[in-house]
Amino acid sequence: MSEKLQAIELEKSYNPKEFEERIYSFWEANKCFSPIKKKNTKNTFTVVIPPPNVTGVLHVGHALDETLQDVIVRYHRMKGDETLWIPGTDHAGIATQSVVEKKLKAEGKNRRDLGREAFIEKVWEVKNEHHSIITKQLRKMGVSVDWDRERFTLDEGLSQAVREVFVSLYEQGLIYQGNYLVNWCPSCGTAISDDEVEHEDRKGGMYHIYYKLADGAVLQNEAGEKIQEIEIATTRPETLLGDTAIAVHPEDPRYASIIGKEVILPLANRKIPVIADSYVDKEFGTGVVKITPAHDPNDWEVGKRHNLPVLNILNPDGTLNDAVPEKYRGLSTEKARKAVIEDLEELGLFKNEEKIKHAVGCCYRCHTSIEPYVSKQWFVKMQPLAQKALDAWKKGDVVFYPQKWENTYAHWMNNIRDWCISRQLWWGHRIPVWYCADCGKTIVSRTDITECPHCKSKNIKQDEDVLDTWFSSWLWPFSTLGWPEKTEDLARFFPTSALVTGHDIIFFWVARMIMASLQFTGKAPFKDIFIHGLVRDKQGRKMSKSLGNGIDPLVAIEEFGADAMKFTLTFMCGSQSQDFLIDMESFKLGSKFANKVWNASRYILGNLAGRTIVPVGRDGSLNSLKELDRWIYHELNEAAQTVRSSLDSYRYNEAAQKVYEFFWNNFCDWYVEGTKLSFKYGDEKEKDRAASVLLAVLEESLRLLHPFLAFVTEEIYSKLPGNCAEGALPRAKILMTSDYPEEKKERIDEAASIRFRTLQEIVRNIRALRAECGIDPQLKLKVSLYIEKNSPAEAARENSEIIEMLSGLSGLDFIDSLKEKPASSIGVVGAGFEAFLITGDSIDIDQLKKRFEKELEKNEQNASKIDSKLKNENFVKNAPPEVIEGEKEKHAEFLRRIEKLKGYLEGMR
């Protein structure tokens, strides 16, 4: 049944603040975020959100993560897949505990003043307070997560999963405890894993020190002189107090005579052996190194090979302990370094210091220098788990987008080290291990115990440490769905479908999730892994608090709206994990596009009064439509196919660029403008037909755009007439849960596409020619058009009014021969046509011709110079690749300009 339309008013200006919050509440109220099982739905699509730290504040990197997930989730939901996106937060052991400890410090207290139980209560208070901040931020971003399934890594169910995994790995012999060298953060007071150590370039010194040979031993130097000391270079002179040997290469003839002898350790005055080990580089420095097994990972390995004593000289807070001479006890490593150098200098045992810049291992949380430190910790044997993860990748069970990350993944898996999982914190999953003081047994249990199962003693104590935060995060894809219980959600939605994350946590999190999932479910946790680049500032720097160059997503949303921010991030996110540069100005791209969608929709809806929707194309046939209509349906069809293909392979930027190009360039600039002729000159039937097609294409365009501009498209969609879909059929009630556009073969019309592309070329050429000639845009001139027979440009004869209107002309006529070229005109040549702009007295054609000739000569000279440069073997051999590429681009641009100028001059002949 036909529907008489009323004018539909949208607000004059696009104002996202007016509707974004309201639209989000509307989606929540209508349960749009829950999995929807449509008819004939067989596929599921599941994503778990990378859980942000519960006490953190979301930054633009999080915004990128959530945006890309939101786009792909909305797309699959509209495709008809039963779609679930699980939100949640991470308890973030070190980070969260640090927040609370800082607050206590400001009050002159520490956690031990409160006691464990009271301290943890405090942390829960802070967690609850910060959690609401994060969820508010996520809602502001418009993420379509299922809030009913929100998880937290310390939830009861997830805690049960952690216990199950720990005990199971222990029972399989894959978890063990021992005294090992670990990465110790003196500020956080805990061990951290290798992957949590970041390396920063810092200024330092290379200190050259003498060690005297003991018991009268001598060494002959290169000059043939007998000497009694050996020169050693080190960046950590304070650790010499923990040396238990010095080492030389076994095949170094310079030191063969002293292997097995001893030296006197400076300042400590104890004897240590000279050992031979192939770890030593004969060519580096003097070819002698100090060995401190307790404070260097390489020395630790050397020490194990030679059964050297392990002498720990540090306290947990990073100060020197009682194992060193009294004067150095209690000093920080920096103060001890200074004191040691001064004392060596006084003894004549210090040669010199070289200023250097070197990579220093730092805590990823507080950036304190990490100390290699021997302590009793819990570890996971990773190699057996890594092998399964490698095999799964080789079989294609997990696929990386882009593929280049597969090599990184394989390298890490092949070179994996055991994972230190214990942390000297109070906040987190407490290690499920108890020690019996009476019988000395260690008990590992899935449930809390109150007595020793071996001797029934009540004198038991639980391990004080908690598990590394990542120990709960690596279970995230299946623990969030109810594992180890056999839940309906686990059966329906696991394995999950895709993981979207940055390349900075491939090993921290991605690889570990694959290992855990294969070990405990027998399946890979997800099929697809999209690794995106990192967001950097316009100078290419990583965004950080210290640089003050970060972007707060909420500030961007306040200024531009969530759609604008998210569209910009999607548009700029390359498919090859390239880092990209951004600032607040960048979001204007998304803002302008959202504005364009709003204004185009406002124009269409505001000019429909009195029109009747007619069932054009209901039978699937578009033959009765005008060429302009058939062309836009062809372009819409091609856009839907391209966007689907791009999103199916995580080429986000290509998808965003395609919807931008289709809506702005094809729909707004050409189609909407072209339909104005029908409304201006057509009869009532023609106007109804034009309105019906225009509305149908707008309705489908909003569905195409929705994953990228969720709020504004939903707001506009809600205003559309009820029967505005193609064929005057009813539209969906809610855009978010409607069907995504798909390719329809009956819409393919290559002939219309080719013919209309030629019309566009004619219009663009006329516009460009006007601009080149400096003609006032308001001045309407005439054009004479010559069309080659049987060329696509013949479409111009049937669409002369469109060309005339879009080119800003006062008239358009056709000539049958180039001999009929009008006087006082300038021509421009295209594929199958030549257009002559009749300028009359508006410009001096002779002067313009001279200008073009002069510019042509200059461009030919420039092109020739670059051509010679690129043919110069020395230049190509020595110039940086980016310089060569830049020259090639300039050369191509000169050639394009030359071609255009020749065309203009040809048209002036």
From Swiss-Prot:
A single GO BP: valyl-tRNA aminoacylation
Main location: cytoplasm
Keyword ATP-binding recorded: yes
Catalytic reaction equation(s): tRNA(Val) + L-valine + ATP = L-valyl-tRNA(Val) + AMP + diphosphate
A GO CC term attached to the entry: cytosol
Top-rank lineage group of the source organism: Bacteria
Positions that bind ATP: 545
Localization: Cytoplasm
Any one GO molecular function term: ATP binding
Motif ('HIGH' region): 52-62
Keyword Coiled coil: yes
Keywords in alphabetical order: Aminoacyl-tRNA synthetase, ATP-binding, Coiled coil, Cytoplasm, Ligase, Nucleotide-binding, Protein biosynthesis
Residues spanned by motif 'KMSKS' region: 542-546
Enzyme Commission number(s) from the entry: 6.1.1.9
Record remark on domains: ValRS has two distinct active sites: one for aminoacylation and one for editing. The misactivated threonine is translocated from the active site to the editing site.
UniProt family annotation: Belongs to the class-I aminoacyl-tRNA synthetase family. ValS type 1 subfamily.
Biological function: Catalyzes the attachment of valine to tRNA(Val). As ValRS can inadvertently accommodate and process structurally similar amino acids such as threonine, to avoid such errors, it has a 'posttransfer' editing activity that hydrolyzes mischarged Thr-tRNA(Val) in a tRNA-dependent manner.
Subunit structure: Monomer.
HAMAP family to which the protein is assigned, alphabetical: Val_tRNA_synth_type1 (MF_02004)
Designated name of the protein: Valine--tRNA ligase
Source organism (scientific name): Treponema denticola (strain ATCC 35405 / DSM 14222 / CIP 103919 / JCM 8153 / KCTC 15104)
Gene responsible for this protein: valS
